[in-house]
Amino acid sequence: MSLSIDVTSLPSISSSIYKHESSSTTSTISGKSIGRSEQYISPDAEAFNKYMLSKSPEDIGPSDSASNDPLTSFSIRSNAVKTNADAGVSMDSSTQSRPSSDIGCDQVDFSLNRGIKIDAMVDSSISISTKSKKEKSKHETKNRKCYPKIEAESDSDDYVLDDSDSDDGKCKNCKYKKKYFALRLRMKQVAMQLIENL
């Protein structure tokens, strides 16, 4: 039996990642401000510090905080401004951290679009051939020796060896010759009895 597997193409994955600019909102940022359009309220640093230190941490609310995000709540005392909800929030606590003019400001226009293209094709074929096995079995059948069929009514004397059947007289004086003939006759009788019972 022969087994052949033909895989013409394995799965191929091709990915393309591309970037291009888009018309996202341009924001002016400085220091540690968040990435969206902000309106800054520039408080007096000393007045702000006095205001924040005069309040207990439990009394500080969203209007006093620089950020409502729990990840940045650690910066409430040092980097907060008082502003309303509609205006943007800033994490800058003093005017000194911001440049005095627009020259030093960073203009940010950023957008990332990612496209991934995946192509996968699997072509396979399996063929199983049993020709060699059949040819082998025919070859073995030809090599088998053909023995005479023993009929139930056949004469037992035809199947008893005599001295002429031996090779070069090797079995003429064999001490097991009598036992062999007796055993062969007994086996023949058992075979005949089995055939009759069937």
Curated annotation (Swiss-Prot):
Binding sites annotated in the UniProt record for Mg(2+): 92
Q: Per its UniProt record, what InterPro entries does this chain match?
A: Rotavirus_A/C_NSP5
Q: Which UniProt keywords apply?
A: Glycoprotein, Host cytoplasm, Magnesium, Metal-binding, Nucleotide-binding, Phosphoprotein, RNA-binding
Phosphoserine PTM positions read: 67, 154, 156, 164, 166
Which intervals carry biased composition (Polar residues)? 91-100
Q: Which cofactor does it need?
A: Mg(2+)
Q: Name one GO molecular function term.
A: nucleotide binding
Give the UniProt subcellular location, in the record's own words: Host cytoplasm
Q: How is it modified after translation?
A: O-glycosylated.
What is a biological process (GO) this protein takes part in? viral genome replication
Cellular component GO terms held in the UniProt record: host cell cytoplasm
Chain intervals for the UniProt region annotation (Disordered): 16-37, 53-72, 85-104
User: Which is a Pfam family this sequence falls into?
Assistant: Rota_NS26
Task: Report the function annotation for this chain.
Answer: Plays an essential role in the viral genome replication. Participates, together with NSP2, in the formation of viral factories (viroplasms), which are large inclusions in the host cytoplasm where replication intermediates are assembled and viral RNA replication takes place. Orchestrates the recruitment of viroplasmic proteins such as capsid proteins to these factories. Participates in the selective exclusion of host proteins from stress granules (SG) and P bodies (PB). Also participates in the sequestration of these remodeled organelles in viral factories.
**What assembly does the database describe for this protein?**
Homodimer. Interacts with VP1. Interacts with VP2. Interacts with NSP2; this interaction leads to up-regulation of NSP5 hyperphosphorylation and formation of virus factories. Interacts with NSP6. Participates in the selective exclusion of host proteins from stress granules (SG) and P bodies (PB). Also participates in the sequestration of these remodeled organelles in viral factories.
Q: Which family does it belong to?
A: Belongs to the rotavirus NSP5 family.
Protein name in UniProt? Non-structural protein 5
Instruction: Identify the taxonomic lineage of the organism of origin.
Output: Viruses, Riboviria, Orthornavirae, Duplornaviricota, Resentoviricetes
